[in-house]
Regions:
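Terminal connector regions
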Residues: 657, 663-682
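Low-complexity, acidic Ser/Thr/Pro/Gly-rich terminal tails and inter-domain linkers that flank the onset
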Residues: 541-574
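A surface/secretory-pathway sequence property marking extracellular, secreted
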Residues: 603-653
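Aromatic-lined, polymer-binding surfaces characteristic
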Residues: 228, 232-242, 250-254, 260-299, ...
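Sec-dependent signal peptide cleavage junction
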Residues: 25-39
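Aromatic (Trp/Tyr) and acidic
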Residues: 38-53, 57-142, 146, 192-230, ...
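Bacterial N-terminal signal peptides that target proteins for export
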Residues: 3-17, 28
């Protein structure tokens, strides 16, 4: 009767072709999920510190290594810097621009004439690697808004430099994606790089991606007002955040903001074509909120009345209490900024207010002069709905729940609005609005029925399986093993309406993480520290903790192999060993010369030439064609050392492996005519 015998998973070093090494076992080093002692108390300094780090994990482009604070992230999608300036074909390589448009504006789009357009930079949307325009713009402006409103919190906790790095990375990308002619007129703006349908089937580190990443542009023929206005808003806020510390950079941001808004003013007001790029992933439903969001910031900066005149025809005074501030509904934020503009005088010197805003709006919109209207009253109405269940649902444990997708995202956005309200309406002191926000944040940090923090790495009871390829380091999201890296500061989707939550990597509802989910969370942490911060709230020192390499000394530059062997004996003493291996690494630098060797002894054999090796499965070839592992051998190792030692070799010439792993399965052994003893193999 045929029997099988299993060898447990082993760790072996993986050889680079530049250095041969023996395969030996090495210990597994476990990642800790917390950088300090577990705590269930709400520490808003620590929460603010951690919250910014999520963006280090989602940086994209040729400058990731210079800017990220995570050792496990490196430059990725560097080919975004050389997108072929051509209409995309069936291979999805190129742009959505027509050849005639490219020919007409080649000097603007490709000033160096190399045939490419540079769109590197920015941030991956979520655990995937597409750069979607709406969440990119929203996250950029919302992070900037939080810094603008609660700058002291960042400075007191030592986080100003970090948030400024993130804000520059966002806004530098938005400027790079905006193509101006010699008159500073916007000719084109790239609002998306990558395609969700192409990107989403993969589950690997961004550093090794090689899939097609088409670029999507808006132009005067297809203006897509929501995209261009949302980008203008972020750049306008960026001006306010840097005008006192880097005035030249601030002016550059403002110039781009004005140019983008002028494009939106001049061209037909048009909702984005959701089929051209975002498809079903981010379906924008209106442009008016983004347009007013940008115009409000530009008035606040310039005092130019034309920006208020642009708001009046499209302003929806009644919208804010009907939903929560988010990428597809900016009205809650718009109402806050218009509330600031409606003040008698600005809170900060050099900015502008217009106390007659509501009066002029009523006249413009043919409203009754007797109708009670007040921007801040509208904001307070929204907050009271969040608090009492007038909008959404209050869970049994008191959590404000709005939507299945990203409940924590909406909850923290509502918190941010409540905290901004108290800043301007309660002399910067907490009222019932801030108290409500504080209780909601305490819930998310661990004061909930599950005693679970919905912020990755915050304490020992934090969620541990965010839906994120780079932190996962595994071959598929269904893998339930511990993730390779801790995605510190990421706010996951959150609980459902019954306070339940499932902590699984594959669950992209409960455990989704995105740049828009974290954006208001960062600002809310800063606002809560402004309201409640004291000396008991301290940041984590020496953060993030240094990760230990899992590769064994003498290994291939932080490359190693996890392997599992199953023996399959045949009658008469013959048999084979089925080897399943995964190449793994802590390196963020892709290598294309990976080789793995499996050594075995032929001491029991009469004729080693009968040994055969053959491939059973190559995940790289299946998922990343034309990548293809090649198995060869057997080869004698060194007859002078031991004539009985042989090895088989698997190599992936030309395939990049970094911060990820792919399964490879092969057989080695004898089917007849000799004795196979796997007990002395390694």
């Amino acid at each position: 009767m045929m029997k099988t015998k299993q060898h447990g998973w082993k760790r072996w070093t993986a050889a680079l072709t530049s250095c041969m090494m023996l395969a030996v076992s090495c210990p597994t080093s476990m990642l800790t999920q917390t950088a300090s002692a577990a705590d269930s108390d709400a520490n808003f300094a620590k929460a603010l510190q951690y919250s910014v780090y999520f963006y280090d994990a989602n940086m994209c482009g040729t400058d990731v290594s210079e800017n990220t604070r995570f050792s496990w992230r490196g430059d990725c999608h560097t080919y975004d810097a050389k997108v072929p300036l051509q209409p995309m074909g069936n291979d999805s390589v190129g742009t959505n621009l027509s050849q005639s448009f490219i020919d007409q504006y080649r000097d603007v789009l490709d000033p160096d004439g190399d045939g490419y357009v540079d769109l590197s930079g920015g941030f991956h949307d979520a655990g995937d690697h597409v750069k979607f325009g709406m969440p990119e713009d929203y996250a950029a402006s919302t992070l900037g808004w939080g810094y603008y409103e609660f700058r002291d919190s960042y400075e007191k906790t030592g986080q100003a430099d970090h948030i400024e790095t993130v804000l520059r990375y966002f806004n530098d990308y938005l400027m790079k994606c905006t193509f101006l002619d010699s008159n500073d007129t916007v000719i084109a703006h790239c609002y998306q790089v990558g395609d969700g349908d192409i990107d989403h089937p993969y589950w690997n580190a961004p550093e090794v991606d090689e899939m097609a990443r088409p670029a999507f542009f808006l132009t005067a023929d297809k203006p897509q007002t929501d995209y261009v206005a949302a980008a203008a808003a972020s750049l306008a806020v960026n001006y306010l955040n840097f005008k006192d510390t880097d005035p030249d950079y601030a002016k550059q941001s403002l110039d781009y903001a004005k140019a983008l808004f002028a494009f939106a003013q001049k061209n037909e007001k048009q909702l984005s074509d959701n089929a051209d790029g975002p498809k079903q992933y981010y379906v924008s439903s209106k442009w008016e909120d983004d347009y007013c969001w940008a115009a409000a910031w530009l008035y606040k900066i310039t005092g130019d009345h034309q920006y208020l005149e642009e708001i009046y025809p499209y302003y929806d005074y009644y919208a804010a209490p009907s939903y929560v501030y988010c990428w597809n509904d900016m009205w809650g934020g718009v109402q806050c900024i218009l509330g600031e503009i409606s003040e008698e005088k600005p809170l900060k010197a050099g900015e502008y207010t217009y106390p007659n805003f509501i009066t002029e709006y009523k006249e413009s919109a043919n409203k009754s002069p007797y109708e009670e209207m007040n921007c801040w009253a509208s904001v307070k109405e929204a907050i009271d709905k969040y608090r009492t269940g007038g909008l959404g649902t209050i869970t049994p444990a008191g959590y404000f729940w709005l939507n299945t997708w990203g409940s924590a995202r909406y909850n923290t956005a509502a918190q941010l609005v409540a905290l901004v309200y108290d800043k301007y309406n309660n002399n910067g002191k907490p009222s019932e609005s801030s108290e409500w926000a504080k209780g909601q944040m305490e819930y998310l940090l661990g004061n909930n029925p599950l005693k679970r923090s919905y912020v990755v790495g915050y304490n020992e009871n934090s969620v541990k399986f965010p839906h994120h390829r780079a932190s996962s380091g595994l071959t598929k999201c269904e893998d339930t093993r511990e993730q390779r890296h801790v995605l510190y500061g990421a706010l996951v989707g959150g609980p459902d309406a019954t306070d339940n939550h499932i902590d699984l990597t594959k669950d992209y509802i409960y455990n989704e993480v995105t740049i828009d989910y974290n954006a208001a969370f960062v600002g809310a942490c800063a606002g809560l520290y402004a309201m409640y911060g004291d000396d008991s709230m301290q940041v984590t020192p020496d953060f993030p903790p240094k990760e230990e390499s899992s590769g064994e000394e003498g290994g291939g530059n932080n490359y190693w192999v996890e392997a599992f062997a199953v023996d399959d004996p045949c009658s008469g003493g013959a048999g084979t060993t089925k080897v399943s291996m995964k190449v793994m690494t802590d390196s963020t630098t892709p290598r294309t010369d990976i080789t793995v060797r499996y050594f075995f002894s032929t001491k029991e054999m009469k004729d080693p030439s009968l040994v055969v090796v053959n491939e059973l499965y190559d995940q790289a070839a299946v998922e990343a064609a034309p990548a293809d592992g090649v198995v060869s051998g057997p080869f004698q190792y060194d007859a002078s050392y031991d004539p009985n030692i042989y090895y088989m070799e698997v190599s992936w010439d030309g395939y990049k492996i970094a911060n990820s792993n792919k399964k490879y399965q092969c057989n080695v052994g004898l089917y007849y005519g000799d004795t196979w003893d796997p007990s002395n193999d390694w």
